[in-house]
Regions:
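Active-site nucleophile elbow and catalytic-triad environment of alpha/beta-hydrolase enzymes
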Residues: 77-97
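Gly/Ala-rich beta-loop-alpha elbow adjacent to hydrolase catalytic centers
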Residues: 24-33
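Acidic catalytic loop of the alpha/beta-hydrolase fold
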Residues: 110-115, 138-140
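Short alpha-helix in the alpha/beta-hydrolase fold that links the catalytic acid
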Residues: 102, 116-125, 146
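Catalytic histidine-centered segment of alpha/beta-hydrolase-like enzymes
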Residues: 136-149
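Short beta-strand/loop motif that positions the catalytic acidic residue
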Residues: 99-100, 105-108, 112
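Hydrolase active-site cap/lid region
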Residues: 35-80, 133
Length: 161
């Protein structure tokens, strides 16, 4: 929640200094960016790269966070605990965005082992946004020029057209 609060504060500050404001986040940053769109309707552009739309799925299914998962389970938390209504506000896949889908871009990797393609598909269906799929994993997505170029073009067109 702290990241979401800070992103919203920064956006408010920026809106006093410019005419258009967007947000771009990857992975957990994508979670923060996505959650801001469930609260605010005045983003001019939103780019989500491999967004963690279901933190519980990452925690309980990704092999890359095995040690964290083991610690959480040892503390007595189960996947069922994430079904609680209080948790829904932290799950983009259980919330609705306030942003027009034409102002949103999702980029995701076919080979992502952190944020599963099926999780991204569920977010895409719920929010009515298309996904730009690339042949990358979670980390290699950031290192490829093509998705960066695609996203930069989207932001330029959406923010400055």
């Amino acid at each position: 929640r702290q990241g979401v609060a800070e992103a919203r504060l920064l956006a408010r500050w920026l809106r006093g200094r410019t005419t258009r404001v967007g947000i771009w986040g990857m992975s957990l940053g994508g979670l923060v960016a996505a959650l801001t769109t469930t609260l605010d309707d005045d983003w001019d552009a939103v780019a989500l790269w491999a967004p963690v739309a279901e933190p519980d799925e990452v925690l309980f299914n990704s092999g890359l966070v095995k040690f964290l998962r083991e610690a959480v389970i040892q503390s007595g938390v189960s996947k069922d605990d994430f079904a609680a209504p209080e948790i829904a506000s932290m799950m983009p896949n259980r919330s609705d965005t306030k942003i027009d889908p034409s102002k949103m871009l999702v980029v995701a990797g076919d080979y992502d082992q952190v944020v599963s393609p099926s999780s991204v598909e569920r977010l895409s269906r719920r929010w009515g946004i298309e996904v730009h799929w690339v042949r990358h994993g979670h980390i290699s997505l950031m290192l490829s020029r093509a998705p960066v170029r695609y996203t930069a073009n989207f932001l330029e067109h959406t923010l400055f057209a």
